Regions:
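Bacterial Sec-dependent N-terminal signal peptides
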Residues: 1-23
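Short, conserved micro-motifs composed of acidic
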Residues: 21-302
Length: 302
């Protein structure tokens, strides 16, 4: 998955312990996959939203002026076996030819938070030049109009990256990835309180037991209040691995747990999503026997 080169996506130790999943866990590659990227699947009110390349009528990916692919969010029909059918691109006049990706949704499906690009160049102290960093926006769904009222979250400083938003089940906390001052790894996990999807509290970095000296990306909070995220920290199975952390824990020394195979693989595994039944969901992966890009996989018996 590639976003604009100057819009560093940053997806891309803490000792990891084996997270013992049942040997019956089943993971299958979805039929919707092809040589393009498919990732960040989320189920909302019986429909599946996911991110993929914007494409032309001939099926080729659309690129920007930097020759990098543009991404959009698609909505499909959820089949009983987890397959995604009849995908359609979410259309909005406020989102034409822009990267819109890695979204999270309120339970009622009325609000969407997603990753996009700054339109104002920020300072990149490492590269000593201005870059267009990533930001988080919020949109509202209005019947008959679709997704409207695109708003950049007020704490998104153009000098830093803000990406991969994830709402808590009750909608009062937004988790995300950032590179703001105070980040100890290449990208860390943060959170902020949310009130009525209009006002936001103080940005707080998650603890050092969760963040590492490497990259943390794609957070997700399940219905039982467990935080899932991907990291390339030491001790993994290869590339990006998916980890779990119980947000209900009172143990300040508790460390994230690496998920076992077949959820994690020797390739990059990221963008974990678990349905409210706590047994089925989706992951994205670049593993062996894939279709060539980021592929979507459906898992069951978790």
């Amino acid at each position: 998955m590639k976003l604009k080169p100057k819009f560093t996506l940053l997806f891309l130790l803490i000792v990891t312990f084996g997270f013992s999943q049942s040997e019956e866990v089943e993971v299958k590659k979805l039929k919707i996959n092809n040589k393009l990227d498919h990732f960040a699947a989320r189920v909302v009110n019986g429909e599946v939203y996911f991110s993929s390349n914007l494409i032309r009528k001939n099926g080729r990916a659309i690129s920007d002026k930097f020759a990098q692919n543009l991404y959009g969010i698609y909505k499909g029909v959820l089949a009983e076996d987890g397959e995604i059918k009849d995908p359609e691109l979410i259309q909005s006049p406020e989102a034409i030819r822009s990267n819109i990706t890695a979204a999270t949704y309120s339970k009622d499906g009325k609000y969407m938070y997603f990753t996009s690009n700054q339109t104002v160049a920020g300072k990149n102290k490492l590269q000593k030049k201005n870059t267009y960093n990533l930001l988080i926006q919020r949109a509202e769904y209005e019947e008959g109009k679709g997704w409207v009222n695109f708003t950049t979250l007020p704490f998104c400083d153009p000098d830093f990256n803000f990406l991969h938003p994830a709402l808590s089940p009750d909608g009062t906390t937004l988790y995300f990835v950032s590179t703001i001052k105070g980040t100890k790894g290449k990208s860390d996990l943060y959170k902020v309180s949310v009130s009525n999807h209009e006002t936001y509290g103080e940005v707080t970095r998650l603890s050092d037991t969760i963040n590492s000296s490497r990259k943390e990306i794609f957070p997700f909070v399940s219905a039982d209040n467990k935080l899932y995220f991907s990291s390339d920290r030491r001790g993994g199975k290869g590339g990006l691995d998916i980890y779990s952390y119980d947000l209900k824990s009172t143990d300040t020394e508790e460390k994230p747990v690496s998920l076992d195979k077949p959820i994690n693989s020797f390739g990059d595994d990221f963008s974990f999503f678990l349905n409210d039944d706590l047994t089925t969901g989706y992951i994205s992966s670049r593993r062996l026997k894939g279709e060539g890009g980021d592929d979507l996989y459906y898992f069951s018996k978790f």
